[in-house]
């Protein structure tokens, strides 16, 4: 059964493209998703309440963050590094902010880092979702050696979901995380 999806994303030239088709181009326009049908990945490229890919500020950030990179893993790493540096006020005072809100306030905790990173990935053609679980941190909130609740981003690259954690500054992350659930943050 064909599913029609409208996706806005940045072209490699930095222009906004809208596509409307039963299949969605994944990995920056490369249709090779190693056995996963593009329509199975459509949900991870679509906009939603948390990731408005028509937002001019997000489009600008996605273009700047990508810097012309096309190779999916290198692109994911560039985006992760960008978000790590872009969110300048690291705190727990923000609720679960949308990517558009984070783009403007530049503040938040792991959830804001994760949502912004997923949005920038989608705008650059990387299927993106968030993972929720716990992560080991050596020091947090005055405590040493703890596992704390955490949220990070996953990009679908070369036939698998790869962890990218802008809050903890890691790409293709070390095994300090335990995933409880994953989500596209699709509207309910």
Segments predicted by a language model, with ranges:
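Acidic low-complexity segments
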Residues: 2-105
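Generic structural hydrophobic/aromatic packing signal, biased to beta-strands
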Residues: 1, 5-7, 62, 130, ...
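Active-site neighborhood of thiol-dependent amide/isopeptide-bond enzymes
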Residues: 68-151, 172-175
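Active-site rim recognition segments
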Residues: 28-41, 49, 81, 126, ...
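A mature extracytoplasmic/lumenal domain signature
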Residues: 9, 132-134, 168
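Weak global preference for isoleucine
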Residues: 3-7, 59, 75, 134, ...
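Short C-terminal domain-edge/linker segments immediately following a structured domain
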Residues: 53-57, 111-114, 183-187
């Amino acid at each position: 059964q064909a599913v029609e999806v409208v996706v806005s994303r940045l072209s490699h030239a930095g222009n906004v493209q809208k596509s409307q088709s039963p299949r969605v181009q994944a990995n920056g326009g490369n249709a090779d998703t190693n056995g996963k049908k593009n329509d199975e990945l459509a949900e991870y490229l679509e906009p939603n309440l948390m990731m408005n890919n028509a937002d001019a500020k997000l489009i600008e950030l996605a273009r700047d963050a990508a810097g012309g990179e096309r190779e999916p893993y290198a692109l994911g790493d560039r985006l992760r590094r960008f978000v790590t540096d872009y969110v300048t006020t690291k705190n727990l005072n923000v609720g679960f902010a949308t990517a558009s809100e984070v783009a403007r306030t530049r503040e938040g905790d792991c959830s804001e880092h994760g949502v912004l990173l997923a949005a920038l990935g989608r705008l650059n053609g990387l299927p993106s979702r968030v993972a929720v679980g716990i992560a080991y941190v050596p020091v947090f909130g005055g405590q040493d050696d703890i596992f704390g609740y955490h949220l990070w981003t996953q990009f679908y690259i070369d036939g698998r979901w790869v962890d990218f954690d802008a809050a903890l500054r890691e790409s293709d992350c070390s095994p300090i995380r335990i995933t409880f659930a994953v989500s596209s943050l699709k509207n309910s």
